[in-house]
Amino acid sequence: TELSVTLVPKKRKYMEVENDMNTVRTKTKYKLGLALSGGGARGFAHLGVIKAMNEYGIRPDIISGTSAGALVGAMIAAGKTPEECIEFFHHTKVLQFARFTMSKMGLMSMCGMEEKLKKFLGVKTFDELPIPLVVTASDINNSISVHFNAGELIPCVLASCSIPVIFIPVEINGIIYVDGGLFMNLPVRPIRDICEKVIAVEINSIDSHEKVSNMIHMAERSFHLGLAANTRIDKKLSDIFISPENMIKYGMFDLNHIEEIFEIGYKKAKEVLKDFNKVIHTPIVIAN
């Protein structure tokens, strides 16, 4: 049985994580939850999906995100529009996000991303977010998924995005965390029992015959294969499943095709969500 915990202050209203099911328990029930998967730069497709949702008048009552999904989820939960998020990435160079380091724990540090996010989001804690957010990270020492929903926001988001070997892990309260996708790349389970319906967006397409050309590519490829393997349960638990096609050609750090990736997510969501009002009242899964 996979155990799971949440790190939150004791003397405050908070959500608890049920150890045997990876679900968040709360007296609050939400009509619609949105689960966003990890996938590196492919996460720009999440923003396209959310733009389509906005055009259809579909607003999530709670967001659950892993890795890139946690980053996008934090931005949207903070009240930013998809367009504002795209502008944020356009005006920030890669080396402002991640910097090479000599650390034995990872090739790059995300200290630059931390400062940029603080300024852009305009909030410091989960409680300040207009939309409730759950961020999934991996406790690498105890081999468990951890679902954050209170306390400081940005350290949790960075922990969720810390791809092993590539990025230096994030330490929170003495515990070392890495990318949430390691154990749960499509975080439907944390919000499944507290939402009437859940839309899940999975952006981690895999080419079964992809060639590996260098060390970074090998690490990226290996990680993506692991992500694909752990999404099956959560996919089945969603009510509407959106998986944009043609994502394979975009690498984890591809910031040169932001609009293309965004548009792929937007078009797929427009197609899948056109019958949202009919679909949301039936227990079926829409796949790509």
List where the protein language model places each region.
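Patatin-like phospholipase
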Residues: 7-66, 74-288
